[in-house]
């Protein structure tokens, strides 16, 4: 994917800048890589006053207001981190019947956009480049079915009420020393 960022006036008076994210398929609710790059550019171009040791920039992005922090050394950005919009889980262990795939278990969560998180092993596929086309096809089918049957509900941002994508994970690769409620 190719990403771009259009800098605009902020929506909120408490923000320094507004950002619209673009990519080869359209627009996005957010992009962490772009936030990091923009923070460096904004600070080092002199668009904001450098505050040593950390300069804060508040951005309005489609998913809400975020704060980025540039650690400064010799008037240069040494590192960047940011606080994203609040994230939350809408559903854990939900099951949906997907044509040609059968029953698929997923978690539905928001972290700047709604994503369905699916353990790839239940589909008898490995996360390997050789199976990329099959994985993409399955992701599209799962996204379509969930979008048809499940309402994504953001508590106060109605324009975020849609499924942005499917994230495949391989839970067999996760090693948790202390069992949690989800992985017992």
What function would you assign to each model-found segment?
Residues 120-122, 169-171, 182:
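Histidine- and/or cysteine-centered catalytic micro-motif in compact active-site loops
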Residues 129-154:
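Internal alpha/beta scaffold segment
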Residues 174-184:
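Single conserved hydrophobic/aromatic residue that forms the stacking wall/gate
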Residues 1-14, 88, 100-103, 107, ...:
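ATP-binding N-lobe of GHMP and related small-molecule kinases
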Residues 45-48, 71, 145-151, 172:
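Short regulatory "switch" loops immediately downstream of catalytic or recognition motifs
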Residues 1-30, 34, 38, 156-173:
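Anion-binding (especially nucleotide phosphate/pyrophosphate-binding) glycine-rich loop
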Residues 104-105, 153-155:
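Generic recognition of flexible, low-complexity loop/linker segments
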Residues 24-134:
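Acidic, low-complexity central loop/insert segments
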């Amino acid at each position: 994917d190719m990403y771009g960022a259009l800098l605009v006036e902020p929506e909120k008076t408490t923000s320094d800048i507004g950002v619209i994210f673009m990519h080869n398929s359209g627009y996005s609710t957010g992009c962490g890589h772009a936030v990091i790059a923009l923070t460096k550019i904004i600070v080092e171009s002199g668009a904001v006053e450098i505050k040593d040791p950390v300069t804060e920039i508040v951005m309005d992005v489609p998913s809400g207001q975020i704060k980025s922090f540039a650690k400064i050394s010799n008037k240069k950005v040494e590192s960047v981190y940011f606080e994203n919009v609040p994230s939350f889980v809408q559903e854990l262990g939900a099951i949906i019947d997907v044509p040609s795939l059968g029953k698929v278990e997923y978690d539905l969560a928001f972290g700047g956009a709604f994503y369905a998180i699916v353990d790839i092993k239940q589909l008898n596929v490995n996360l390997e480049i050789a199976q990329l086309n099959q994985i993409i096809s399955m992701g599209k089918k799962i996204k379509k079915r969930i979008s048809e049957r499940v309402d994504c509900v953001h508590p106060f941002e109605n324009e975020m009420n849609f499924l942005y994508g499917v994230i495949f994970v391989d839970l067999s690769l996760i090693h948790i020393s202390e069992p949690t409620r989800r992985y017992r």
